[in-house]
Amino acid sequence: MIKVKLVRSWIGCKPKQRKVLDALGLRKIRCEKSFEDNAAIRGMIAEVKHLVEVSE
C-alpha cells in the first residue's frame, strides 16, 4: 500500500495536474489517501510529485 498526502496547494498548477489530483481524490491540503502499489498510481504520483508526500 502507498499513502499519498497533499502537502502543497494546487493553485496555479496545470489543468492536467489538477485532473490527476482529482483522480487521486486529493482535494484539500493534508488530505491523505491509500492506494495499491501499481504502475498506474506510480505514474499519477510522478505527475504531481512536487505537491505530494508519498509513504509506503
UniProtKB/Swiss-Prot annotation:
Name the Pfam families for this protein: Ribosomal_L30 (PF00327)
Q: Which UniProt keywords apply?
A: Ribonucleoprotein, Ribosomal protein
GO terms (BP aspect)? translation
A molecular function (GO) term: structural constituent of ribosome
Keyword Ribonucleoprotein, does the record have it? yes
Gene Ontology CC: large ribosomal subunit
**Family, per the entry?**
Belongs to the universal ribosomal protein uL30 family.
Q: How does it assemble?
A: Part of the 50S ribosomal subunit.
Any idea what this protein is called? Large ribosomal subunit protein uL30
The source organism is Nitratidesulfovibrio vulgaris (strain DSM 19637 / Miyazaki F) (Desulfovibrio vulgaris)
| Gene name as annotated | rpmD
